[in-house]
A protein has these predicted regions:
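Face-selective signature of the C-terminal outer-membrane beta-barrel domain
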Residues: 249, 255-257, 261, 294-453, ...
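Membrane-embedded beta-barrel scaffold of Gram-negative outer-membrane proteins
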Residues: 302-306, 311-336, 394, 475, ...
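Conserved C-terminal beta-signal and adjacent last beta-strands/turns
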Residues: 11, 46, 209-212, 426, ...
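Transmembrane beta-barrel wall of Gram-negative outer-membrane proteins
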Residues: 199-227, 231-269, 291-306
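Short strand-turn segments of transmembrane beta-barrel domains in outer membranes
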Residues: 161, 178-210, 223, 230-232, ...
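Extracytoplasmic beta-strand/coil segments of soluble accessory domains associated
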Residues: 61, 86-133
Length: 710
């Protein structure tokens, strides 16, 4: 059946791509185009709309996007009681976060029921560049060098983006969009203090300063430092982040962008607790050796140019992005020697394990967009690109026996990934400009090599996949927009899997979506959608042979609803609500038909904000129903708390923001936020280096902040 679907969709895409006459195409609605025409200074500005599937993440981009999509804007980030990006993402239907610290430093993201430790099954980008340690071989976010002061908005695309943004995009794409460099120099100083109770305070200082030094050269510096303790014992935290960006307009049609970033993190990890210890005091820590540290230096250089017309090719535009990252991270944990006691938190550690990994990543992605001719009123907009990524990974694990100081090297591995991807899509708009059909194809080629320095063993793994996609958008009238899409997505075999595998295929999924957006006026927005993710060839470990194989299958299906409304007679009040239903089931193995671990069937989001003069009051909440922590869907928690039902929880947050004064380009504001307002106690399980026990979720915290812009 999957083979038939693949060929049918491929043939349909090929027919739609080549059969129609070549035409020019505009991706924006007339209203959006008129708005943009008032603000751009340079001809190249529109490259962000026509050359990129996601555009600029403006309201019209979202309204006319042929897939499920939501944008969290700057005001929501600033006034929504968000300690970190984690807090903001909790309010998006379909996203669940296992927050262990409240700092956002080690995000644990689940998108539409797809989850792996340290967000391994979520594609997160910053300005279109992957944030993963290694986009193919190590997709986790163990290092997350992004602060709230850097980001203007978050663009969450849950469908329809697989052709242009891959790999690891089965559940969708989260793009963190940086603040634009202002035309006039501006500086913002901010400081927040979060009180976690029992004398524990977490400080966060931030600086953002930038502007155009000349008519053609802009510079932006963003820096922040987070230090202190989060709300639990054994939680010392020290995070430093510095990012410098530059824009150089060579002329009105040529733009050069550069970015350099340095990120440092050192954290103690409180870890999970045994059930008895959790009941006694969820704030305590019984894992005194657990900690984490990491370093990364990231850089990017991009060039954008509007060439104009080349014969039959009209409005030709080039975007060429190059990026590199050199990273290291190390998790240090206490362990027991017996396999039946490895991760027990209620017993003193016998081993001190270190797991340093080094990553060197280089990537380059040129992308062209153009329109072609005009015949019969049909319009086309083409986008084609190629991306090459090289990854080199050093993987070490060592154990220090505490009783006698004996050190044992457990793993000494080296990996190389050489990836090449190519994609093409064609957005075809019919004469009345109401129906747009976008077929596309993506080709992924990955060569992975593994070398065991200790034994001399070498292993190779190759994957070759063609990934079709097709999206359809229909503007029924000024109020209603309908969409549907189908696409093939993949996640490459991870470096630790190819060691014990035998020429593994990539994990593949068919994604289907259909939905609608309704916007009768500027005060009301409704989005409703349904989806199906048919995930096959998931890589699983055969416990008998200890070999990884493409055995696993899961099916994720559900619906998502988002509402936003402001009363006609009280426009200062904005109310929002959301609901997500998820039916994620295992489709293979001994537990076929049971729920996928960690997935909640129901998610509810409620919130609102009210602005009166210079004061804004915001209230938000999220609810997740119960979940299971193992494939067998075990209800009763066992003695070591490695399995058992996870509780439902409803968490409320609030923030009051007030502008103290604003004049002559200066603004001074203050805020007070309470997270987990009613101090709801709940826990997670299976979090990375402390998988047994109850991982306590953040309790109530109070955050006071000051911000000065001049």
């Amino acid at each position: 059946m999957s083979t038939f679907r693949f060929h049918a969709l491929t043939i349909a895409i090929a027919a739609a791509t080549w059969a129609l006459p070549p035409l020019a195409f505009a991706t924006e609605s007339p209203d959006a185009a008129a708005t943009d025409a008032q603000t751009p200074i340079r001809a190249l500005d529109t490259i962000q709309v026509q050359g990129s599937l996601l555009g600029r993440s403006r309201p019209d981009d979202v309204q006319r996007y042929a897939g499920s999509r939501q944008v969290i804007d700057r005001e929501q980030l600033r006034n929504g009681g968000n300690r970190s990006l984690d807090d903001a993402l909790q309010r998006v239907p379909g996203i669940k976060i296992f927050d262990e610290t409240g700092t956002g430093a080690l995000p644990q993201l689940m998108l539409r029921g797809l989850y792996e430790s340290r967000s391994g099954r979520v594609q997160v980008l910053e300005d279109g560049i992957p944030l993963a340690l290694a986009p193919y071989g190590q997709t986790s976010l163990s290092l997350f060098p992004v602060g709230l002061n850097q980001i203007d908005r978050i663009d969450i695309v849950r469908g329809g983006a697989a052709v242009q943004y891959g790999p690891n995009n089965v559940g969708g794409v989260i793009n963190l969009v940086s603040k634009e460099i202002p035309s006039e120099w501006s500086t913002t100083l901010a400081h927040k203090v979060t009180a976690g109770g029992q004398g524990q305070f977490l400080q966060d200082s931030a600086l953002s300063s930038g502007g155009y030094l000349t008519d053609n050269l802009g510079l932006q510096v963003d820096a922040n430092r987070t230090y202190g303790e989060y709300w639990r014992a054994h939680s010392d935290t020290d995070i430093s982040n510095l990012r410098v960006r530059a824009e150089w307009w060579l002329d009105d049609t040529k733009l050069l962008k550069a970015s350099v970033q340095r990120y440092l993190v050192d954290m103690d990890l409180a870890g999970a607790l045994s059930p008895d210890d959790y009941r006694r005091d969820p704030r305590q820590s019984t894992r005194p050796l657990d900690s984490f540290n990491g370093r990364t230096t990231r850089a990017s250089l991009s060039y954008e140019q509007l060439f104009g017309d080349w014969g039959p090719l009209k409005d030709v535009r080039l975007s060429w992005t190059n990026f590199s990252a050199r990273s290291s991270r190390n998790f240090i944990v206490g362990m027991r020697q017996a396999a039946t006691e490895t991760w027990r938190s209620d017993l003193p550690p016998q081993l001190r394990q270190t797991a340093p990994r080094d990553f060197r990543v280089v990537g380059s992605e040129p992308r062209l967009s153009w329109s072609m001719g005009d015949a019969g009123g049909v319009r086309q907009q083409w986008t084609a690109g190629v991306r090459a990524v090289h990854e080199d990974i050093d993987f070490l694990v060592g154990n220090l026996r505490l009783r006698d100081g004996l050190f044992t090297s457990v793993r000494d591995w080296q990996f190389e990934d050489r990836a090449l991807a190519a994609y093409v899509s064609n957005a075809i708009t019919l004469p009345d400009e109401r129906l747009t059909i976008t077929p596309g194809l993506r080709y992924e080629r990955l060569d992975s090599r593994y070398f065991n320095r200790a034994t001399g063993l070498r292993t190779r793994n190759q994957t070759r996949d063609v990934l079709p996609g097709l999206t359809v958008g229909f503007q029924a009238n000024a109020e209603w927009f309908f969409y549907a899409d189908g696409q093939r997505s993949l996640r490459a075999p991870q470096v630790t899997q190819i060691i014990f595998g035998n020429n593994l295929d990539a994990e593949l999924a068919w994604n289907y979506e259909a939905g609608t957006r309704y916007q009768p006026n500027d005060r009301t927005r409704i989005q409703l959608g349904a989806y199906l993710i048919d995930f096959d060839q998931q890589i699983q470990l055969d416990n008998t042979t200890r070999v990884f194989r493409n055995l696993g299958k899961t099916r994720h299906q559900g619906g998502e609803l988002e509402l936003q409304w402001s009363p006609e007679n009280l426009r200062a009040l904005t109310l929002n609500a959301g609901y997500a239903y998820l039916d994620a089931s295992q489709e293979s193995g001994a537990f076929r038909g049971l729920r996928v671990p960690y997935t909640s069937r129901n998610q509810i989001i409620l919130g609102g904000n009210y602005t009166l003069g210079h004061t804004t009051v915001a209230l938000s909440s999220y609810y997740f129903s119960k979940a299971y922590s193992d494939a067998a869907n075990t209800v009763q928690e066992n003695a070591i708390a490695s399995v058992g039902e996870l509780p439902s929880y409803w968490v409320w947050n609030t923030q009051v923001s007030h502008t103290l004064f604003e004049r002559d380009g200066q603004k001074f504001s203050a805020s007070l936020a309470i997270n987990n307002l009613f101090d709801r106690q709940y826990w997670f399980r299976g979090v990375d280096t402390s998988p047994w026990g109850r991982q306590a979720a953040p309790s109530r915290t109070v955050t006071a902040g000051l911000e000065y812009t001049f």
